[in-house]
Amino acid sequence: MNIPHGLKNENEMPETLLALDIGTEYIKAVIAERQEGDNLIIRGVGKEHQAMGNMYAGAIADIPAVISACEKALSRAENMAGVVARTCSVGIAGELIKGNTKTVRYRRKDGNKPISDQEMQLIIKRVQDKAEEQAREEVALETDNPDVEVRLINSAIVSLSIDGYKVSNPIGFKGSELVLQFYTAFAPLVHISAIEKVCAELNLDLVAVAVEPFAVCRACLGNNLDSNLSAIVMDIGGGTTDIAVVDNGGVEGTKMFGIGGRSFTHQVASRVGLDFDTAELVKIQYSGLLSNDLHTLKTLTVSDAERMNEVQNILNVPDRMKKVEKAIADNTEVWVSGVGLALSDFSLLEALPNKILLCGGGAGLSTLQEALATSDWYEELPFARRPVIHLLDDVDIPDIQNATEIDLDYSYITAFGLLRVTVDTLNSEEEDTGLRAKLAKLLQN
């Protein structure tokens, strides 16, 4: 992609970074300027709607179509920022992303010998190899493809202890037994290859591919890797719902299931007898979001006004309104069951965090927030009390400032996290103490 006339190359400006959130419903491009202390200032954003068929279950299904949509989103972000950014991270989601936390006990031959970089690298490599084998077996079973290949995309040390003593960096310590809780996430190689192809065609320097809820956790932590944040993060997209559990600042694991905003739209379309685009507007109008989506338009066209009237007329018909309510209520019940099932897999925790942070385009659906806040879905899970639900906004994200005139709401939080992952990756490449950087709770792929 050539640099448009009037835009400066990133080499001529302060260091600029790009987050590319390739979602099922929208592609979002966010350009940020990296400041001293790794604070970030958002300079440009771009958004482009995805056509049906571009994505499947959170993964790229049509590479040329996704490239075309990315170009449009990038162009808008670059025009707003006045600079072309090439250094980027991209998010990945979907049910075939396998993120788990394992507890490993390692008995050392000589407890009086200080732990070295080389020894820790060997331990981490063994843990990653074992996790990769398990992830490959799971994906092979789900895809009925015994030859499937997977690749490590994210890993993080959740906790470390030596002879029962917790440490943040084991290098130099003596001890006989090292207990390591280690989070790893793997994705099918075909999914990662598609992302790499898109970035290559866009002439982008891809520095990291990150599991999207993992990236959101990074956004919430900001520059403070010693944070004691404990929360459940839910990224509700168009095709999937991606969940991460953070305990005392460490990522316990990630789970995904294939119900997102578009499944609600399909239900409304099927039961009310509408085309997909009209059903989408009916869904968001029902949730009180249509006016929010349209407020970004400087002028309301005749076509926009006609569509709004059409949607309101549908909801004004009692029989149709009941069908809309029933479709959304039934799908919400299934979605909540999926949330409960996903959280039941976090068996390492005695109690789940009491705070649930929502983001992603689907998080704005009021029925989902209401179901989490008022129903009894949580009672069979290890919560100490009813969890508190919070819809994330840009003001909730530390160390990132929005310098644009765009309201960067919950739907942009994943992109914020991808920017933070980019900074982490660049820092780990710049530092000579590679393992020490890894042991700062975040390990890069």
Model regions: which residues?
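Short beta-alpha connecting loops at secondary-structure transitions
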Residues: 252-253, 266, 323, 399-406
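A short, acidic, amphipathic alpha-helical segment used as a generic capping/interface helix at domain edges
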Residues: 335-347
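Short loop/turn motifs enriched for small/polar and acidic residues
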Residues: 90-95, 359-361, 392-394
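Conserved phosphate-binding/catalytic loops in two-lobed NTP-binding clefts
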Residues: 113-118, 373-413
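Glycine-rich phosphate-binding loops at beta-strand->alpha-helix junctions
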Residues: 187, 288, 351-377
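Short, surface-exposed connector motifs at secondary-structure boundaries
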Residues: 177-179, 247-251, 348-355
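Acidic, glycine-rich loop-and-beta core segments that form the ion-binding/anion-interacting portion
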Residues: 214, 219-291
